[in-house]
């Protein structure tokens, strides 16, 4: 998350050295999601490659340089309130939480600020991106070493580090 003065101080320009730990970036400052040329949001996502990842998996920026700190802060806080307090799981619902925060803060829409700031923030990346907010656990998975032709079902056991079954585990 970056909150500062105009742009993002070029922190997304040269790439990152974060390997496969690609973050969900929010940079709600002037011009970070601008549609006139490449934006900081795009640069965060475009850096790196499939074989040499770097940068972000998705980013939210603001499409214009005419923003105001107070409104950007509310959208920003609404995004993170959605992720951590309301346990919203997707990039798009987190951004919508930011939009609802500004709407709820300024329901009378002073100077068209509510409508404007809702339309200026934008998401670069998959809106259905699942946002993970905790460190994954190590699991022990027990499964057959071979599967006979014609098999239509099998037992797969997923246990946590204490040997307890993991409820709702999905194995692919």
Predicted regions mapped to residue ranges:
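Short, ordered, surface-exposed loop/turn motifs in non-cytosolic proteins
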Residues: 152-153, 162-172
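Short, solvent-exposed loop/linker segments at the N-terminal edge
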Residues: 145-151
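Active-site-proximal C-terminal subdomain of hydrolase catalytic domains
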Residues: 33-135, 139
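Short solvent-exposed capping/turn motifs at the termini of beta-strands
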Residues: 158-160
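Generic structural signal for beta-strand residues in well-ordered domains
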Residues: 17-18, 122, 164
